[in-house]
Every structure is written in structure tokens, then in C-alpha cells.
Amino acid sequence: MADGPAYALQVAVIARLRADTDLGAVVGPKIFDEPPPSQYADYPFVHLGRLDDEAVRIGCHTDDDILFTIECHTRPVAGRVEVLALAHAVRRALDDAPLTLSGHSLDWCDFLTQSVNQSRDGATWTAVLAFEASVAAAV
């Protein structure tokens, strides 16, 4: 069975982030497709958040517009400085990136927006970056 467009995009996004040396310099190998259980969380880390897929019918074929988020989590002494650096590295790695998807082709991947906030615990900072990608079936 062939992978669906959302899964193919997930695999490509995680691979791109893991290959990024700027991001790796801050988080090392802690780039996940889902968040680690809280008892095992080793800050800082990055993970895929939401993944919303919408079919877009164009003539006789269908593309998928996929909205997805990447979440950056940190507990630095310096406050939001580290989470902003992580967010910037994620944005640079994915905005207009030439991602290679198995069984599909990427029309585009664009950064949309980001939100940064401090958790109620007063120690954890989170940045959530939103992207949109258009994925078509490989021809």
C-alpha cells in the first residue's frame, strides 16, 4: 500500500529537520514525529504538531493542501531567547524547502505564522510554527 500524502510529508519534514545543522546544534537528535512522554522529555526538543489535510480538486485530479505545525520546547535560563532561536532554525529549514516525498510531489511548502508563549509552570517556553504545503500525486 502506498503512503498517503500527509504521511509522506511528515517523513520528509522530519528528515529535513534532522538534517539541518543549525537546528541540530541546539537540539541534537531530539527531533520527533510526536512529542516524547513528559517523564522522558529532555529539553530542548522539537516535534511535529498538528497535521490537517484538505483535498483540493483541480479538474480531473486532486491535490492535498496540508497545514502542519512544528513545536519547539525549551526550558532555558535565558527565557525565550533559545525558543526563538529554535523557531528561526525551523523556519529557515522548511520555508520554501525542496522536500522530496515518497510517491508524491511537493508543489510548495510555505511558512505561515508562529506563536511563542511561556507555559504555566513558568519554566517551559514553546514556539508553534505553522506551515502549509501543497502535495500532488507523483506522475
What do these predicted ranges mean?
Residues 57-63, 119-124:
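Short, solvent-exposed beta-strand/turn "edge" segments of beta-rich domains on protein surfaces
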